[in-house]
Amino acid sequence: MNVLIIDNFDSFTFNLYQYIGEILRAERAPFNVIVKRNNALILADIDTIAPERIIISPGPGAPDDPAYFGICSDVIQTWGKHTPLLGVCLGMQGIAHVFGGKVGRARVPMHGKTSPLWHDGAGVYRGLPQGVDIMRYHSLAVEATSLPDCLTVTSLVHDTHGTTNAHDFASVVQNMAENVEIMGIRHREYPIQGVQFHPESFATEGAKVMLKNFLFGH
């Protein structure tokens, strides 16, 4: 399996590289994990790499600024239509931006803090219990009211911890209370997923489960 990680100049990128390598090595199948900076790629290079999975890393800045997001928007628009793609933190914000969503200041900036996660049990969350702790490093967030119809909310954090099953999760998503922050999105048609938190952090519970689901869940 060829996996391309596009690095948005973030220190967490190496963690992603390490985790992905460990997961694939355990499967005892041939693999190649390639890391490229977002300003060191053109689309023709990706054609040559021929990735079977693409991960867009965290990073500083905002997704509407090419100085920070580089080629990533073009990759989402082109390769994301047919190749499973996971956006992490800035990567998720970029997915929302590309499809017409807005990214603004987070309700509460979170840097190096954990929160319990509530999710839909599908995609990267398959087999993951509700309420797992996830590590957050972000001051920007996807604005819930701006999310286009082509994207669905797959996970969130909120101040009251009563959500314990998919039915309740769906109700919270439908109402999108003010104390809710979107932590995950998925495209309804294309194999594109995004997570606002850091699955590559040691403090995120079930991190390798999520990444393995991304790698082999298609």
How should each PLM-predicted stretch be described?
Residues 201-218:
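Acyltransferase
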Residues 123-189:
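Catalytic beta-strand/loop cores that center a nucleophilic Ser/Cys/Thr
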Residues 1-4:
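Extreme N-terminal starter segment of soluble prokaryotic enzymes
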Residues 38, 46, 50-54, 199:
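Proline-aspartate-enriched helix->loop->beta-strand connector
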Residues 29-41:
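A short beta-strand-loop structural module common to alpha/beta enzyme folds
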Residues 19-30:
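A short, Lys/Arg-enriched amphipathic alpha-helix followed by its capping loop at the start of a domain
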Residues 51-133, 211:
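Cysteine-nucleophile active-site neighborhood
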Residues 33-35, 103, 153:
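Generic structural signal for residues in well-ordered beta-strands
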